[in-house]
């Protein structure tokens, strides 16, 4: 692992910057230093802005390594384990509403395992006044497109706006006014 990770004494704190409307993604690292770490589980608290009382609800967070929605729309849990001596990045995401007040939101993420003690990380997320376009998808470094892994778009027969459905009359198919 990088020396910086060892030299830094703060292994229990995460600080991030985000914009309103952003699908905010961050990573936590699990290092299996002495033995395998089996069946990781990630729990979230709400993040609370102490100045306004507003919250980013715990239910809005997901850890892509341990849970998701499959191609049929079925919610699943996934076993995520780390071999001895290895590091596993845990990818976490949450949708920040556009109407969220700017300020600092604080809460916790707790990572537990079947065979190791739990570790709680204090999370502090500073939300700016800026409202980001397209949830941040135009800036690939934000990794906001990870939310697409759990997308339920396309599970029904409805056409997604701004597209219009094909029209069939007898043996003729029409699309956007053309036959």
What are these regions (language model features)?
Residues 1-10, 23, 27, 33-92, ...:
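Surface-exposed binding patches on compact interaction domains or structured appendages
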Residues 12-17:
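Short beta-strand segments of immunoglobulin-like
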Residues 19-21, 31-37, 99, 114-116, ...:
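Short solvent-exposed strand-capping/beta-turn motif centered on an Asx-Ser/Thr pair
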Residues 28, 103-114:
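A short beta-strand micro-motif common to beta-rich folds, especially ectodomain repeats
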Residues 119-128:
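C-terminal edge beta-strand
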Residues 127-166:
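Low-complexity, Pro/Ser/Thr- and charge-rich linker/hinge segments at domain boundaries
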């Amino acid at each position: 692992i990088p020396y910086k990770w060892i030299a830094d004494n703060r292994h229990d704190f995460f600080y991030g910057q985000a914009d309103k409307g952003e699908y905010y993604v961050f990573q936590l690292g699990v290092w299996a230093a002495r033995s395998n770490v089996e069946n990781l589980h990630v729990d979230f608290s709400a993040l609370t802005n102490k100045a306004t009382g507003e919250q980013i609800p715990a239910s809005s967070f997901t850890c892509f390594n341990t849970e998701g929605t499959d191609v049929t729309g079925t919610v699943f849990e996934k076993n995520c384990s780390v071999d001895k001596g290895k590091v596993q990045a845990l990818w976490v995401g949450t949708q920040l509403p556009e109407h969220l007040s700017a300020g600092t939101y604080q809460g916790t993420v707790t990572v537990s395992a079947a065979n190791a003690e739990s570790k709680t990380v204090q999370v502090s997320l500073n939300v700016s006044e800026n409202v980001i376009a397209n949830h941040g998808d135009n800036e690939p470094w934000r990794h906001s497109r990870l939310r697409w892994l759990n997308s339920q778009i396309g599970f029904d027969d409805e056409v997604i706006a701004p597209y219009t459905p094909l029209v069939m009359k007898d043996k003729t198919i029409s699309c956007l006014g053309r036959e």
